[in-house]
Amino acid sequence: MLSWALTFLIIAIIAAVLGFGGIAGTAAGIAKILFVVFLVLFIISFIMGRRPRM
C-alpha cells in the first residue's frame, strides 16, 4: 500500500509541474486522499502504541 502512495505522490508532483488537468488532476486527487488516509493511520498507531498494555 505504501508503494502505491509513493507512486501516486510522484505522479502528483509531475502533474503539478505540467499543470492540473485530465489524468494529472485525478492522480493529484488520489495522492491527496492517500495522504490523509496515511496521516490518520499514523496518528491512530501513534496513540495506540503509547497506551500501557494490560
Curated annotation (Swiss-Prot):
Q: Which organism is it from?
A: Ectopseudomonas mendocina (strain ymp)
* Subcellular location(s) per record: Cell membrane
Question: What does the UniProt keyword field contain?
Answer: Cell membrane, Membrane, Transmembrane, Transmembrane helix
Query: Does the keyword section mention Cytoplasm?
Result: no
Q: Does the keyword Cytoplasm apply?
A: no
- Tell me the domain of life: Bacteria
Question: Could you give one GO CC term from the UniProt record?
Answer: plasma membrane
User: What name appears for this protein in its UniProt entry?
Assistant: UPF0391 membrane protein Pmen_0080
The record lists the membrane-crossing segments as 4-24, 28-48
Q: What membrane topology does this protein have?
A: Multi-pass membrane protein
Give the family per the record.
Answer: Belongs to the UPF0391 family.
